[in-house]
């Protein structure tokens, strides 16, 4: 999950398309990994919180949130993803292997 978020250094209105593409990629990939039993249901649900966080940032950007606030939200999401990586160390590799 952290690799997905590391694609975004600083986000602004021009990031909207890339964020949407990443949300779609995560949604599809996580579903495949869960359906093929490559990740546990718990990992799937927790990873969904990162995808949901990206969706929140996307919605806030479309509502005109400041770049500073968007990047603050992104930083918090990256911290959550690092924690998730500690719990499920194989998750990031499995997600990235599907690109």
Enumerate the predicted regions with their spans.
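Intrinsically disordered, low-complexity regions
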Residues: 2-8, 13, 54, 74, ...
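N-terminal acidic leader/helix
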Residues: 2-44, 86
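Intrinsic-disorder-associated interaction segments
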Residues: 8-19, 43, 50, 63, ...
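Generic L/I/V-rich hydrophobic alpha-helical segments across diverse proteins
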Residues: 16, 23, 30, 47, ...
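Amphipathic alpha-helical binding modules
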Residues: 64-99
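General structural signal for alpha-helix termini and helix-helix connectors
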Residues: 32-39, 56-63, 67
């Amino acid at each position: 999950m952290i690799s997905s978020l590391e694609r975004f250094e600083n986000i602004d209105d021009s990031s909207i398309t890339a964020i949407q593409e990443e949300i779609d990629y995560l949604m599809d990939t996580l579903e495949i990994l869960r359906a093929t039993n490559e990740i546990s249901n718990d990992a799937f649900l927790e990873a969904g919180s990162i995808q949901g966080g990206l969706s929140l940032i996307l919605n806030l950007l479309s509502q005109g949130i400041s770049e500073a606030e968007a990047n603050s939200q992104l930083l918090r999401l990256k911290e959550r993803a690092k924690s998730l990586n500690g719990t499920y160390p194989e998750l990031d590799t499995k997600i990235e292997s599907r690109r």
